A protein has these predicted regions:
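Bacterial N-terminal signal peptides that target proteins for export
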Residues: 1-11
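Hydrophobic core
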Residues: 12-20
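Sec-dependent signal peptide cleavage junction
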Residues: 20-35
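Aromatic (Trp/Tyr) and acidic
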Residues: 34-104, 144-192, 236-261, 285-319, ...
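Short, surface-exposed loop/turn segments at secondary-structure junctions
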Residues: 37-38, 84, 110-122, 196-200, ...
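Short coil/linker segments at helix-helix boundaries
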Residues: 106-123, 127, 166-170, 188-204
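Carboxylate/His-rich catalytic cores and anion/metal-binding grooves
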Residues: 124-138
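Solenoid-like repeat scaffolds
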Residues: 264-269
Length: 427
């Protein structure tokens, strides 16, 4: 696989849930610029920078965001990432993002190293995994810190949140969706960082969280995130996802047996008994990524065919049985109006991994999937009808007003200062 392909895949892994963002004068490898339409190393660098803008608690020395400071220091668990442009710490989407960052490093470490981003990538991954470990409460986990309703009533930088609201509440549960997602993130991290001193700790905690999730097999206690990050897909997809990553991290075949037990309970196509293949992978529904891992882990023909069906639905104009994902002008694979680039770039990442693993010997599929993932990431970087970048701070005419309280920098809940333009660039 070419270095350029590895690098594009690494970018895709970083841009799944949050905006692709950052700021400052930073160093990145420019050697790919000559062979690529865009500077993918810069895009990767700015993708990673966003996670540093999201850091909660005491900031590490390596944090490069000059306009950020320590924040929410009285949280019951400090650290982790704030959600999107807000200040709540929701562990379901946070752990999903961590698991995908880990997969990117696990699968494409050479490309990340070639871009000059390996050390900072690793730092960002360990930062969030350390937080997930600290959320352990024995038979439960801390799954959320902050109240979404209260958070949305105030607009200002996160460094001032405690002055406005005081100590924030934390919430615990044993719900399978979030404990399994946290398990998957830690197991994927252990696999990606297998030479790290922290790998054994991540693996041990991943197994512990999985035991909670498997024993509970319910989302009843997952309540405070409703209305913000509901578990619409249920919990079987997260159990399937976590069991596959635990098999990779531990080599214990019992996790493959558990993965197989999950399959009959996974989502189906509407009015059908066929396993769902048309929906995209996201923070709520990790079935398609888990199915790809299962096909890699087992080599089972049936599940390789499922992966092909999913990717054909997304990447071929004729789709599957005459049906395919919608195409926006310019070639974007359009699934939903909320976070359309998120779905498209994630599908592109799965296409890249599949072409490098279970379909590496199929030249036609490798060509098809390569064209697909390049089209999707390049659309985000500027190959679209508006000829603009959708990455803040990157390329031509990027967005200038992202929904982000801290980068906006209003000082008094927009009562008097009336800041029109963002005080800080959220690359």
């Amino acid at each position: 696989m070419s270095g350029l392909k590895r690098l594009i895949s690494g970018i895709t892994a970083c841009s799944l849930l949050f905006s692709v963002t950052g700021t400052g004068v930073l160093q990145y490898d420019t050697s790919y610029a000559a062979e690529a339409k865009y500077n993918y190393a810069e895009a990767l660098q700015k993708s990673l920078y966003f996670y540093e803008a999201q850091q909660a608690g005491p900031l590490p020395e390596w944090n490069r965001v000059s306009w950020r400071g320590d924040s929410t220091m009285s949280d019951d668990v400090t650290g982790g990432w704030y959600d999107a442009g807000d200040h709540v710490k929701f562990n379901l989407p946070m752990a999903y993002s961590a698991s995908m960052l880990a997969w990117g490093l696990y699968q494409y470490s050479d490309g990340i190293k070639s871009a000059g981003q390996y050390d900072i990538y690793r730092n960002n991954l360990e930062f969030v995994l350390d937080y997930l470990v600290e959320c352990d409460r024995g038979s439960e986990v801390v799954y959320q810190i902050g109240d979404g309703e209260q958070d949305h009533k105030w607009w200002g930088p996160v460094e001032l949140v405690e002055l406005e609201m005081g100590k924030r509440p934390s919430y615990t549960c044993d719900a399978s969706c979030v404990t399994a997602e946290m398990s998957a993130a830690l197991a994927a991290g252990a696999a990606a960082l297998k030479d790290s001193d922290k790998a054994s700790e991540y693996k041990k905690c991943a197994e512990h969280y999985f035991d909670i999730a498997w024993k509970t097999k319910s989302d009843d206690s997952y309540s405070k995130a409703k209305g913000f990050y509901d578990s619409w897909s249920g919990f079987w997809d997260e159990l399937f996802w976590a069991s596959n990553w635990l098999y990779i991290a531990t080599g214990d075949k019992d996790y493959l047996k558990k993965a197989k037990e999950c399959i009959p309970n996974l989502g189906k196509e509407d009015q059908s008994d066929e396993l769902k293949y048309s929906w995209g992978m996201c923070w709520d529904d990790v079935m398609q990524g888990a199915m790809l891992l299962y096909a890699i882990n087992t080599g089972d023909k049936e599940y390789k065919e499922h992966v092909a069906k999913h990717l054909d639905y997304w990447s071929k104009t004729e789709g599957v049985n005459g049906k395919c994902v919608q195409r926006a002008p310019g070639g974007l694979a359009w699934l939903d109006s909320w976070g359309s680039l998120r779905y498209a770039t994630t599908a592109g990442f799965l296409a890249a991994v599949a072409s490098d693993t279970i379909f590496s010997g199929d030249k036609a599929k490798v060509k098809q999937y390569k064209e697909f993932y390049e089209t999707q990431i390049n659309y985000a970087l500027g190959d679209n009808p508006d000829k603009r970048s959708y990455v803040v701070g990157f390329g031509n005419n990027p967005p200038e007003h992202p929904h982000h309280r801290t980068s906006h920098g209003a000082w008094d809940d927009m009562k008097n200062d009336g800041v029109k333009d963002h005080r800080h660039v959220l690359y």
